Amino acid sequence: MIRVAIPTGRMLEQALDFLRNFDDRLLDEEKGRKLRIHGERFEVFLAKPWDLPLYVEERVVDLGIIGRDVIWEQEKNVVNLISLPFGYCKMVIAGYPYVSLKGNGKEIRIATKYENITKKLLENRWGKIKIIKLNGSVELGPILNISDLIVDIVETGKTLRDNGLEVKEVLFESSACLISNVVSFAYLRKEILSFVKEVRKLNDKCN
């Protein structure tokens, strides 16, 4: 049986529905009461999104389903197997309409939970940036005037608009992806590659 971690939160239902395409023994009634769901093919663990890559890296589980944005931010030593047809979102720079992306030599304050991504993508462009690491609602950065801009993922942009903010630039698009532990990929190579082949067929049907 392959151990799979899926993220709690916005992608939970999508990830479970996705896995049910390959294991119909993953029952709904177990969800909500347990952090572990037993199927015929998979043993599924529900994990916080930001903890999930660590569980895969440390081989607590064999596979994980997580947003590509989290993988790029954390840079864990895992095998990135294939993109999945859900969890679509965009990594954006956002701020109040009157705030310019041109720093004009001034330090730009950026609130984000994606500290590494922000540094890699924007430090060379603007030079003088101050990253304010927030773990909660990064929209509070501009609202409380502790940042000029934010870098965050958005799906519809409604939360930004509700708080008077707008998308200034899309940095990249993200979706869910399937990742594997390095050792598990070696020892369970046949089973994992067979699963990836099935996933690829499902992806083709969705496109």
From Swiss-Prot:
Subunit structure: Heteromultimer composed of HisG and HisZ subunits.
Known catalytic reactions: 1-(5-phospho-beta-D-ribosyl)-ATP + diphosphate = 5-phospho-alpha-D-ribose 1-diphosphate + ATP
Keywords attached to this entry: Amino-acid biosynthesis, ATP-binding, Cytoplasm, Glycosyltransferase, Histidine biosynthesis, Nucleotide-binding, Transferase
Subcellular location: Cytoplasm
EC number: 2.4.2.17
Protein's UniProt name: ATP phosphoribosyltransferase
Superkingdom field: Bacteria
Keyword Amino-acid biosynthesis among record annotations: yes
Molecular function GO labels: ATP binding; ATP phosphoribosyltransferase activity
Primary location class: cytoplasm
One cellular component term from this protein's GO annotations in UniProt: cytoplasm
Function, as annotated: Catalyzes the condensation of ATP and 5-phosphoribose 1-diphosphate to form N'-(5'-phosphoribosyl)-ATP (PR-ATP). Has a crucial role in the pathway because the rate of histidine biosynthesis seems to be controlled primarily by regulation of HisG enzymatic activity.
This protein's domain notes: Lacks the C-terminal regulatory region which is replaced by HisZ.
Biological processes per GO annotation: L-histidine biosynthetic process
Pathway(s) of this molecule: Amino-acid biosynthesis; L-histidine biosynthesis; L-histidine from 5-phospho-alpha-D-ribose 1-diphosphate: step 1/9
Annotated family: Belongs to the ATP phosphoribosyltransferase family. Short subfamily.
Keyword Membrane: no
Enzyme class, first EC level, given as a word: transferase
CDD domains: PBP2_HisGs
